[in-house]
Design a protein with these regions (language model features):
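Sec-dependent signal peptide recognition
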Residues: 4-12
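N-terminal catalytic or cofactor-binding beta/alpha core of small enzyme domains
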Residues: 24-227
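N-terminal Sec signal peptide cleavage junction
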Residues: 20-22
Length: 227
């Protein structure tokens, strides 16, 4: 199984650290969060089966926006990138399985888009992701509403959380990449220069609570990439 993943999957992990508290409330959508009680481990799906949410009880949120295969006729084809990020759903499910098996019944939150990226891309802003179609807009809203529910749960029960967005890159070097909202040119900077880029990174709050500098969090001996 591990060999299969090595040959077939190229992942970009986008780490978004969720800081909790009134001054730094994390938000993903202005849509109201459903007032529904969920059971950790359950999979909640909308009535069409287009968007799914595996309910969690940890400060870990995983999003899988680009591995859907459904192509409803009511959704016109989108313009722009539409490549499927194959196996990202499998990676999320395997992570959830092993995490649960080794943590005495704990679950990460996982949000799945089951619709083909050629029809819906919830990883973009709504105009580009749904492109004005009323049906696509509805599913886009459901995806982000589930995501907001997960964020609200993390904020309610934990001091901080982390969001892992599983997508695909097309680089010739087929390795797992960690995305921090920093460009390649940013990463070519010296440590002293890179330290000034903390605020624009998706892991700025990790750096804020770390005893290491921002540059060390990104590429030091104890950075996320060394785990």
């Amino acid at each position: 199984y591990q060999m299969e993943l090595r040959t077939k999957i190229i992942l970009l992990f986008l780490f978004l650290f969720i800081g909790c508290g009134e001054s730094g409330r994390a938000t993903q959508s202005v849509l109201p969060t459903p007032e529904v009680k969920y059971t950790p481990g359950d999979i909640i799906t909308d009535s069409q089966g287009y968007i799914s949410y595996r309910v969690g009880n940890t400060p870990i949120i995983i999003t899988v926006p680009h591995d859907g295969t459904l192509a409803p006729s009511t959704f016109p084809d989108r313009t722009g990138s539409s490549a499927r990020a194959e196996n990202t759903r499998k990676v999320a499910e395997q992570f959830a399985y092993f995490f649960n098996a080794n943590s005495n019944g704990l679950y990460p939150h996982i949000i799945y888009n089951n619709i083909s990226r050629s029809k819906l891309d919830p990883d973009l802003n709504q105009m580009d992701g749904a492109q004005g179609n009323s049906y696509a807009n509805l599913s886009y809203g459901t995806y982000h509403s589930f995501l907001q529910t997960a964020i609200d749960s993390v904020e309610a029960y934990f001091d901080a959380g982390i969001l892992l967005n599983l997508v695909e890159h097309n680089h010739s070097n087929q390795k797992v990449e960690l995305g921090y909202l920093l460009s390649a040119s940013d990463l070519d900077l010296t440590n002293l220069q890179l330290n000034s880029y903390s605020a624009q990174s998706s892991v700025s709050q990790i750096a804020d609570i770390s005893t290491s500098s921002f540059a060390e969090v990104i590429r030091g001996y104890n950075s996320l990439g060394t785990l």
